[in-house]
Amino acid sequence: YPQAHLFGQGDAKQQAKAHQWFGMVNADIHSKFSIIFGPQRYAQSEAAQAEVVASAKSLLQGLFAAVDTHLNGRDYLAEGVSVADVYLLVTLNWAAKTGVDLSACKNLEAYKARVSANSAVAKVL
């Protein structure tokens, strides 16, 4: 569906950047939430599970901080809103629901509001 501009409306380089960010969200961020959502797969005792979750949250803070830095002076991850932005928004919603502290990520606050306000995004979420 190239007419849907799922990876943005920019040139090939910008679309490649959207693919890159989609991959980062999928491989790096989403995978840490898998730990938070199912710590029993990684540890048996409740104490060990709590440690695993705390570690995943700490890793997520670092990953989201890197995204926050990238967003400085940008509206979206690449040129125009893309599926990578929608995916990141989903993980930001997970962060809020699971208690990942992103209070230091000021760019992400504005970004989350901006992407959430997009009418096409609102339709799918």
Which sequence ranges carry the predicted segments?
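GST-like domain detector, emphasizing the conserved glutathione-binding G-site
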Residues: Y1-A54, S58-G62, D68
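Hydrophobic/aromatic-lined pockets within catalytic cores
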Residues: Y1-P2, N26, N72, A96, ...
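Surface-exposed helix-capping loop/turn segments at secondary-structure junctions
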Residues: Q3, T69-G80, S119-V124
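Structural helix-adjacent loops and short alpha-helical linkers that scaffold large soluble proteins
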Residues: D11, A54-S55, G99-K106
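Residue-level signal for nonpolar/aromatic packing positions in well-ordered secondary structure
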Residues: A18, V67, D85, V115-V121
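GST superfamily/GST-like fold recognition
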Residues: K32-I36, Y76-D101, E109-V115
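Long hydrophobic alpha-helical segments typical of transmembrane helices together
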Residues: N107-L125
